[in-house]
Amino acid sequence: MAVEQNIAPAKLIDRFSHDGPGKCRTSEWRFEVPLNHSKPDEGTVRLFARSIHCVLGVDDPELPWMLYLQGGPGLGCKTPLEYAWLPSILEKGYRVLFLDERGTGQSSPITAKTLAQQGDHKKQADLLKRFRADNIVRDCEAVRKHLYQDAPADQSKWSVMAASFGGFCAISYVSMFPNSLVEVFIGGGPCPMVNEPGQVIPRLFAVAARRNEVYYKKYPEDVGRVKRIIKYLKENKVALSKGTLTPERFQQLGVMLGLHGGIDYIHGVVQRTDNDLDMFKFLTAPTLDLIENSGMAHNVIYSLLQEPMYCQGKAGGWCADKCRKADPRFSLNERNAQIWFTGEAIFSDMFESYDELKDLKPVAELLARSSDWGQLYNEAQLARNEVPVYVATAVEDMYVSYDLGCHTASKVKNLQQVVNNTWYHDAVETKASEVMPALFALKEDRID
């Protein structure tokens, strides 16, 4: 994988700007870029972004740009002021661009219906292969070239702020277009540079196991509650507005276990669900809504590309299914001492219990069997990297393997980590007042 250069500037469709509270000015941008940057005649993707900066009396075009890469995969950006870390960035004098990565938010969003427009299942699967980190990065580069089209080459670099999967994209960016970047900040640990999810997901199951132990130690009364709920769901077909509440789907609430406050959130759902069964012998609408709106599996890109986001020349092969089957602690057997929740994982049965995913099961099968995934990282370039990379890393991270992240850190020159055993994966949001000063201390201070 060579360092890339030949990306054409994005085409600006329109831009609208508005003044808001705190002397902030936001702009909404729409761009057009090729679906395939190496073959521009194969179609286009529309990108949506919001930018924000502090107004200093005039609209100062000299403020340095910082790109934000959202976690996921498959999540669009929130509105800028919803990000807890943003004030510390604005205070440093950056102008921040929140880009909905291709297929998310308002950037040619991928849904079951929009995918169906592509034709048969193979065509849908082939399209989705264009929606991984490598092409997200090429889109970013096209947008950067538009923003800096009138700037001298030595003044056309920008910075990157990234979280979670956005950090995967950021490391790809460093390896593909190092001459475009000033610096990179990542919350959520360095990405695992692996070839297939089988190198990652068993490690994440191990963290999920530890989080289950913490959960039941804090809320031992939930052992019986969860068993009663699972028994009820086995014996009754419970309809949701967009699918069916199967025992496995309830078990997937565990995706929250690795977040700050996640254990308490799950306890609240369990307590409320059991209370419904105790009082009414059925689940009430507010409880069902609460369960249905938890997690991310209804997100099409997340469900279809969560395992392929690791793949480089190898197939994913439903790795999470294999891990769950191999570990009896994640069984739904009520004779187990405890019924454990699963963590961040995509299982094949999700394509039966989520309405948005039902028609996509054949697409998911094609992607799971596919091995023709391109390279996501230029490791030779990363080994000689000159772009400063600053990373906030949680030891007990249920979504990005700490061990594999540290291995990545050892392979990327000029990458510095601040490692903390009291942070979880979302600390850049929930503990921004700790994480952001720590990240900037890596940049502005020195250890020796």
From Swiss-Prot:
Residues 64-191 form the AB hydrolase-1 domain. Pfam families: Abhydrolase_1 (PF00561). InterPro entries: AB_hydrolase_1 (IPR000073), AB_hydrolase_fold (IPR029058), Peptidase_S33 (IPR002410), Serine_prot/Carboxylest_S33 (IPR051601). Pathway: Secondary metabolite biosynthesis. One of its GO terms (molecular function) is aminopeptidase activity. The active site is at 164 (nucleophile), 397, 425 (proton donor). It is found in: Cytoplasm. It is an enzyme of class 3 (hydrolase). Its main location: cytoplasm. Its EC number is 3.4.11.5. GO terms for cellular component: cytoplasm. It catalyses: Release of N-terminal proline from a peptide. Keywords: Aminopeptidase, Cytoplasm, Hydrolase, Protease. GO terms for biological process: proteolysis. Proline iminopeptidase; part of the gene cluster that mediates the biosynthesis of aculenes, a unique type of norsesquiterpenes that contain a nordaucane skeleton linked to an L-proline moiety and are of mixed biosynthetic origin. The pathway begins with the synthesis of dauca-4,7-diene by the terpene cyclase aneC using farnesyl pyrophosphate (FPP) as substrate. Belongs to the peptidase S33 family. Homooligomer. This is Proline iminopeptidase aneH.
